[in-house]
């Protein structure tokens, strides 16, 4: 029976000049290489990995479609707000927090939006109506889908 311990094995060609020389096992070399490999994996460019190997912690909690709808909604809101405030160069555009609006009732949402957009020079009513209708179709991000 073969033994796997280094102490019980001797080299077939012993080195008489250096009796303290020990046998290096190939598994030790592999073990060392694997520890350095795991360190180098943390420094890899994630964009070069295939999609199946990319870390997807965010999409574990929320599905991609839901996140995409939120992103499209936020981009639409930003574009509409820019269009509403197009005539005013010195006024900063207001921030509309969709998550905070989702927590409110429809009447409170309308009141909040009117307060945020009170300095808007354009007609804000069509934007508010469209935003409220889109918010009804959008689910909250704080409640992940199962």
Swiss-Prot record:
GO molecular function, one term: protein serine/threonine phosphatase inhibitor activity
Post-translational modifications: Phosphorylated on several residues.
Compositionally biased region (Basic and acidic residues): 18-28, 38-48
Polar residues: bias regions: 1-16
Keyword Ligase listed: no
Record InterPro entries: CPI-17, CPI-17_sf
Span of the signal peptide: none
A Pfam family this chain is assigned to: PP1_inhibitor
UniProt region (Interaction with protein phosphatase 1), positions on chain: 21-25
One GO cellular component, as annotated: cytoplasm
Localization: Cytoplasm
Main location: cytoplasm
Keywords of the record: Cytoplasm, Phosphoprotein, Protein phosphatase inhibitor
Annotated region (Disordered), positions in chain: 1-57
Family of the protein in this entry: Belongs to the PP1 inhibitor family.
Entry function: Inhibitor of PPP1CA. Has inhibitory activity only when phosphorylated, creating a molecular switch for regulating the phosphorylation status of PPP1CA substrates and smooth muscle contraction.
Protein name, entry field: Protein phosphatase 1 regulatory subunit 14D
Organism: Rattus norvegicus
Gene that produces this protein: Ppp1r14d
